[in-house]
Every structure is written in C-alpha cells, then in structure tokens.
Amino acid sequence: MRTYSPKPGEIERQWHVIDASDVVLGRLATHAATLLRGKHKPTFAPHVDTGDFVVIVNAGKVALTGNKRQQKIAYRHSGYPGGLKQLGYDELLTKRPERAIELAVKGMLPHNKLGRKLIKKLKVYAGAEHPHGAQQPVPFEIKQIAQ
C-alpha cells in the first residue's frame, strides 16, 4: 500500500478562535502552532499545508511565568549596520501584544517557505472582538490557565 499524500483540493480548513486571557504564552503558542500545521488531523503531512486558520483574541491579557515580563527581550533588525533594536516584553505587551504572540508562534513553526505560508493563517487581536465572524470559527479551549 502506498503512503497517502494529501492533495491541495482535498484539504478542508476550519477556523478556530482561542481566548488568550490568563493563558501562559508558551502553552498558547504550542496549541496555535499545532492547529496551524494540521498535526491534529489524520491527514497530516510534514511537507504540505494541511492546517487550519487560527484567530487569537485578548492578546493583551496573555500571561508570562516567572520574571519573563521584566527580563525577556524581543529583538528585531532594520537591515542596516548597527540597526539591532531591542524591546522588553513588559513594554512589548503594552504597546503591541499581538506581536508577542506572533513571535512565539512563529518560533514554533518550520523556518522555511512552508512556515512563512503557515504564519499568514494566524490572526491575532489585542481585544475581544475580531472581524472573522463570517467564517464561523470554532472555539478552542486551552485547559491550563495561569496560576
């Protein structure tokens, strides 16, 4: 029997909505990355995009354990010499909480063309509202919450 390889036309994509309120950032990112890759489906193939769309709301209420809020630093580079910028997570979560979740999920996806395609299916919003109601997203509940 030959190994099954999913074809692009056979893949059925769902929309999932995750509430990030009081959920630890790393746990949230692992669940989101699993849904984006499609590892929860029996038709998963590591070289094909079989994943679903993920909408994360309440990104501003995400939890960080320990002293990460004060000590963890997010880096970015402008592309010019001496253009390395750094921002603490305390400031990042107040200014752009969506970016903190995007960085965490992006680090858990493949670092190639497929990963760049998968990250486009992640939609993160700081508040409780999102414009994807027409897609009828299914609520995805994460059991573990911050202590």
Swiss-Prot record:
GO BP: negative regulation of translation; translation
InterPro entries reported for this sequence: Ribosomal_uL13 (IPR005822), Ribosomal_uL13_bac-type (IPR005823), Ribosomal_uL13_CS (IPR023563), Ribosomal_uL13_sf (IPR036899)
GO molecular function list: mRNA binding; structural constituent of ribosome
Tagged with keyword Mitochondrion: no
Pfam families per the UniProt record, alphabetical: Ribosomal_L13
GO cellular component terms, A-Z: cytosolic large ribosomal subunit
Record keywords, A-Z: Ribonucleoprotein, Ribosomal protein
Source taxon at top rank: Bacteria
Similarity comment text for this entry: Belongs to the universal ribosomal protein uL13 family.
Record note on quaternary structure: Part of the 50S ribosomal subunit.
Function: This protein is one of the early assembly proteins of the 50S ribosomal subunit, although it is not seen to bind rRNA by itself. It is important during the early stages of 50S assembly.
NCBIfam families: rplM_bact (TIGR01066)
PANTHER family found in the cross-reference section: LARGE RIBOSOMAL SUBUNIT PROTEIN UL13M, RIBOSOMAL PROTEIN L13
Protein name per UniProt: Large ribosomal subunit protein uL13
Species, as recorded: Salinispora tropica (strain ATCC BAA-916 / DSM 44818 / JCM 13857 / NBRC 105044 / CNB-440)
Gene assigned in the entry: rplM
